[in-house]
From Swiss-Prot:
InterPro entries referenced in this protein's UniProt entry, alphabetically: EAL_dom, EAL_sf
Quaternary structure (record): Interacts with FlhD in the FlhC(2)FlhD(4) heterohexamer, inhibiting its ability to activate transcription.
UniProt source species: Salmonella choleraesuis (strain SC-B67)
Record key words, sorted: Repressor, Transcription, Transcription regulation, Virulence
Pfam families: EAL (PF00563)
Keyword Signal: no
Residue ranges of domain EAL in the record: 1-237
Organism superkingdom: Bacteria
Record's protein name: Anti-FlhC(2)FlhD(4) factor YdiV
């Protein structure tokens, strides 16, 4: 996809691994970076996304679905989950556009990731769009703890999985209360979702601290994103 910002940028898609406590692959998030035409400048999606038009967001979402289609047998063979971020602007389109809905619904291993800044998230199941999405697709709250939402949507059972925000984790990790605080979160949230995951695992030391705390999966700089050509390496030992 080509995005028109101060200059033209093209999207490049990668797979961000999510591991279990034994460092076995359980799933992959499809993420995008944006590179200038000359390749000299690269920007992550979170910096570019606020400047993308609805049409550009739609094109990026479709591009991710197309990539997923090319490697769906890899996900099925290895029983992996795929996560795609769902921008708020695409939510209604996904429910209203039958072709887009069908393209996303064909993947039984696909889950849609939603951020805490999703409009009306604090309404929980009273948010009609969010409730309808949860009826048709497994949802993941991708950055719980970023400070932009309450726990209502979680306790309403809208999310199959919840991922703790990486910045939240890295700030808390510096405190001596990190372990008991994480145990408290696990105890509070686990009954409201199928899987509670943790981001911000950038080192072996951090992985060793987090692994015994009751989380089902882990994500971070310890397992960097890879292009589609390197997917097979993630399941080799």
């Amino acid at each position: 996809m080509i995005a028109s910002l101060d200059e033209l940028y093209h999207s490049e898609l990668f797979f961000l691994p999510v591991m279990d406590e034994n460092a076995w692959l359980v799933g992959l998030a499809i993420i995008a970076t944006f590179a200038a035409e000359d390749g000299a400048v690269r920007m992550p999606t979170e910096l570019v996304a606020p400047r993308l038009s609805v049409e550009e967001q739609y094109c990026l979402f479709v591009e991710k679905l197309a990539l997923l289609e090319t490697c769906q047998h890899f996900f099925i063979q290895h029983k992996l989950i795929a996560w795609l971020n769902l921008p708020p602007a695409i939510s209604d389109l996904l429910l209203l556009d039958s072709e887009l809905f069908s393209r996303a619904a064909r993947f039984p291993f696909l889950e849609l990731a939603i951020n805490e800044n999703y409009p009306g998230l604090n309404q929980g199941k009273n948010n009609e769009t969010l409730a309808n999405l949860a009826m048709h697709f497994p949802l993941m709250l991708a950055n719980f703890g970023s400070g932009e939402a309450s726990t209502k949507a979680i306790f309403d059972g809208l999310f199959k999985r919840v991922m703790l925000d990486k910045n939240f984790i890295q700030q808390r990790a510096e405190m001596i209360s990190f372990e008991p605080f994480m145990h408290a979160i696990v105890a509070q949230i686990s009954s409201s979702c199928e899987s509670l995951m943790i981001a911000g695992i950038d080192t072996e030391a951090m992985f060793a601290r987090a692994a015994p705390l009751g989380f089902s999966a882990f994500q971070g700089g310890l397992w960097p994103p890879v292009p589609v050509s390197q997917l097979i390496k993630l399941v080799q030992r």
